[in-house]
């Protein structure tokens, strides 16, 4: 029903059939001040990260249209976050079995950040890019799933998939070793 539609230009382009690609494929260079934050895992007090994030990048992400979660998972993480976050976490999992390393990372992701829903924090749904977790005071399940998937892929080299449930999101990890527990099969991998 066109009477209830909003147009920026009321004309149909017959050849315009491709949706807009919102993927961010290269790091976004922004000037701005750096915001630093210290985060610590509760079950592993020696796992401490002093992060640094560019406020200019956060301003860019603040107004970014809400997208499919693959956009957040696939977006590059800033050099600042990579350089300040990854070395401490890499050292914490060095030499550990995959299951132990994954548990250290999930404990960091679940306990170093305070929880609040997007509705409570912003008044609307706002999925985060990885850098945003190190800026805002709160995060929720989909933000943490995106961060955990990044850490597991980057630090452990394992495949992951996001699992979307009603009002919840989690990350499944494809381990190279046998792990007790529930599993799913995606593209022939368990």
Give names to the regions the model predicted.
Residues 58-65, 124-131, 190:
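Short low-complexity stretches enriched in small and charged residues
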Residues 38-93:
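Long, charge-rich alpha-helical interaction segments
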Residues 1, 134, 185-189:
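Short, intrinsically disordered, charge-balanced linker/junction segments flanking boundaries
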Residues 1-43:
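Intrinsically disordered, low-complexity N-terminal segments that are enriched in acidic
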Residues 69-134:
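Secondary-structure boundary elements
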Residues 100-104, 108, 136, 140-147, ...:
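Extracytoplasmic/secreted proteins, especially bacterial periplasmic and envelope-associated proteins
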Residues 94-95, 143-190:
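Hydrophobic/aromatic-rich core segments of domains that either
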